[in-house]
Each structure stands twice: as C-alpha cells, then as structure tokens.
C-alpha cells in the first residue's frame, strides 16, 4: 500500500483569463483539427487563435470564438503536402499553439500542445475476416500487459528517464502495443508513447465493493468455455462487486473523467471498460457511454469475460486451454496469454512467485516463449487473430511472469529470440491479410 500525492503537481503563474483546458479533435478523413479552448472567465475565448506547425514550419492558422460563450473553437485545415499520418513506424506529431486575448495583458494566455492524424477502424481483409486497421491498413497489434508498478515507488517510477528507457526497450523488442492494466498513468507517460509510436489499450480502473473471488476468478477460469458469455445483469452485480448504486455511479463518473483526461493522446487506440468481470455491470451501457464521449477509438467492452457481445473486440484471455480462433462479427484479440513464470536469481520481487507454468532457467524460458509464439500464436493469425497481449511486461510483487525483472535490470528471455518471434508474426500477418 502507499499514500500521498498521486499524479503530477505543479505551480504556475497564470493571467486572470487563463486557458483551463484544451479539447483537440483531429479528423483523419477530413484532414482537419478542431481546437476548443476552455477559459477561466466567461467570454474569455472570444478571441481564440491557433497555429499548427509541422517540423517548425507554420502550415495552418486561424481565429475563432463566440461572444456569448466562454469556450472558443476553431477548425484548421491540414494542407495535402503536410499530411503525415501517425503510426508506430512514423509517429509524427504536429505542434499546436493556442492563445486567447481580451485586448489587454491581463486577459492574454498562450499554451503549447500537439496532436496527430490517425484513424482506427475494423475492416474485412481479402478473405472477409475483420481486422484492426490503422489509417485504413490492417495492423497486427502485438503487445504486453503493463501494470505500471515500480519497486521504488509502486505507482511512481524513479525518474522520467526510467520511463523512457522502458518504453524504448519495448519498441526495440518489436512490440507496438501496451495494454495499460487497471491504472491511469501521469500524462507524461502517454506523451512518451505518443512520441515513440507505442499504441496503448487503456483499462478503466477497478472499483466497487468486494467481489466473490471464488466465482469471478477460480470458477470462471475453470469453466471459461461455459461461463464466458454469462450476462452481467443485476442478479450478478453482488458477485462482481457492484451491488450498491453509489459504486455504479462512481464508475460512470470515473469513466467520463478518464476519457476527458486522456482523449487528446494519439497513442490511445482502445478503451477497455471492464477486465475479467472485476466490478463489471451493464457493459453495453458502458460502451454506449464511451461512444458518446469518444467515437474515434476502438472499445474492448469486456476483456476476457463476461462478454456481452458489444464493442469492437472479441476479447479472449487464454492461459489453460487450446487456442481456437473463429472469426465472427467482431475483431478477435487475445488480450491476455502466456505468463510463463521464472524467478530470475538475484532479481526476485518480494512475495509469492505466481505465474502460468514455471521455467527452469533462461534457456528454458526462451524455449517456452518461442514455442508459444511459433506453435500456438502464429497459426491463428490466418484464422482471424488480430491482436495479442503477452502477460506481462515486468515482474511485479507476487508475480514473476514478466519479460523483464521487477527492478528492470534484466530481460529474462533472450532478446534476439523475442525480436525474431515478433518479426515472424508481423511477416505472417502481412501475408495472410494481403489483397
């Protein structure tokens, strides 16, 4: 457990009429960006202006605002010659400067931000199988589960440099995705993902009361093929920890706050409202709320179980059963798998050593990892598997199934083997989705 200040805190001198918030909405198809400024004083954004730069060159600028509204809005067109879509291979960010003024120094404020042009969709490949598409092209989303714990500060990393180093290592191994598991990171973490071209699937934070661990975790895992589609209706809410109206209202409030806080980060490609039934209730309503807040991203309505058939993702967790992918009306993701444990000598985290099968040493872990990728994952790509999330990025307290040790000092399997597997998966996916 930990206590104290969470997230970033700073002091800043601002004018009386300062910009409190920006809402930046890029439109990939229209090649525009709409900027809305919220200000401290009524009518404070009536003389809103915005400038877009690409590589230091001004490519668009405009004025806007509304005399009767404190929230001004401008839409800027991106010229054809400066249209640079964002992707993991080319994470181009446009610089954005926004200002407001009421004609005097006290009413003047300027902020600097950025945005990207990119588009998520689910579209059929040449065989009619739905695939995740980025900017209209099929993309294999290949990533790691990231719980975001650090030995030095649990939720808090030791430094910004440590965060960047970890994210760079993920990219160097050939992954393009992190599933941020039940944690909201400081904005700077997402900024680095934006810059590096790492896609993020963002879980909502767990909540509610005490759930029935025996039912939600043990029984459902044991009988997953039978219970995966259990309705999350009112009779189940007590078992899932959502019996009280207050806890359900709290979830809805936090869902909205999470989207509003993170929606301007281009790295986020998918919202995950529920994971493995933890605090789940009325998942279809959560999806509808997310669509109303942000219709530019994918939604993994219920990661693992209890699947209500909504959202964009047929989301599977599989640690124990033979993997059989059958394409249907949603795009298929293996949103948790693997989890091979090995407590690396000299780097063991405190507590128990939990995982899904235990390797004997580095060579055995590498062998098991390669076999899993080549024998289990690769054959399923042609059958519709379009995203995969290995458990997990690092060891954490009580869990030793990370690719990296908890102290981030060592990669447990051989790096060359991980890179080779990822390259093979990417090549196979390109082959099976080619038109």
What are these regions (language model features)?
Residues 1-192, 196-200, 254, 269-270, ...:
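Secreted/periplasmic carbohydrate-active enzymes, especially glycoside hydrolases
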Residues 167-168, 177-409, 413-422, 430, ...:
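Substrate-binding/catalytic cleft of secreted carbohydrate-active enzymes
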